[in-house]
Amino acid sequence: MATGGLAIIQSMKHKLPPSERKLADYILAHPHKAIESTVNEISALANSSDAAVIRLCKSLGLKGFQDLKMRVAGDLAKPTFQGYRDIVPHEPLPSISEKTAGNAIQAIQDTSDLMDYKELERAVSLLLKAHTVHFIGLGASGIVAKDAQQKWLRIHKQATAFTDTHLVASLIANADKDDIVFAISFSGETQEIVELFAMAKEKGITTISLTQFSQTSVSALADVPLYTAHSNEALIRSAATSSRLAQLFIIDVLFLGMAAEQYETTTGYIDKTRAAIQSMRIK
């Protein structure tokens, strides 16, 4: 059963025009009524219009209202989570731990729900063929880029991950046509990342992006755009906790997808690197 309707709406809501946002808010608040309604009925319930319903489905990248209803129905058939929750002043650690675990589960589940597996398969195929993958990201996304680099190196795949934008520009300037530039940016609007990505496109280098689920400046430049769910990180937004976990989840899916395609070779490399690391431990 198709899922991800609620996650897609939540991810895109902040970029919708007012008439469509009103409908989105109604569907999020009353999902059971939404799946039982026709276009005319849902527009009346939300004090909107039939045309706005059609525009909303188009903005969400869906085939139509029936597609949206099927995805929302799939969401409602799954076990429910508590959603994203923020901490409060002087909150005890057990409560913080519970909320953090819940937010992590929600971010990964929402991201899984809106995955485009055809695009993921394209990404895996391109990454397997690439000579070198240049992961680029700033701030918390830079940490994810570093994680991706170490995973690639462990299976004998050439990869870089630098947060110095001048150094990245130099790498792109000298990159080969069979390299890939993989940009990681939750907002998809970080100026330096957009400029570096545009530089890669001008050179004819294949580009893959990982951004929030939305049409962004970075995803618009990507040959293969990949997405995470738009998590509601309110007060503690600067920590980028849920979005970072969702990004790491996608990197893991790509890594394991590559490993599955070249299973014997990959396990051989992992065994070698594990042995090398273990040999350096104090006995």
Curated annotation (Swiss-Prot):
| One GO MF term | DNA-binding transcription factor activity
Give yes or no: UniProt keyword Flavoprotein: no
* Stored CDD domains: SIS_RpiR
Keyword DNA repair in annotation: no
Which is a GO BP term held by this UniProt record?
Answer: regulation of DNA-templated transcription
Sorted alphabetically, which keywords does the UniProt record give? DNA-binding, Transcription, Transcription regulation
Show where the HTH rpiR-type domain sits.
3-79
Give the domain of life: Bacteria
Which residues mediate DNA binding here?
A: 39-58
Q: Which residues form the SIS domain?
A: 123-264
Q: Which PANTHER family match?
A: GLUCOKINASE, MURR_RPIR FAMILY TRANSCRIPTIONAL REGULATOR
Its recorded name reads Uncharacterized HTH-type transcriptional regulator YbbH
Q: Which organism is it from?
A: Bacillus subtilis (strain 168)
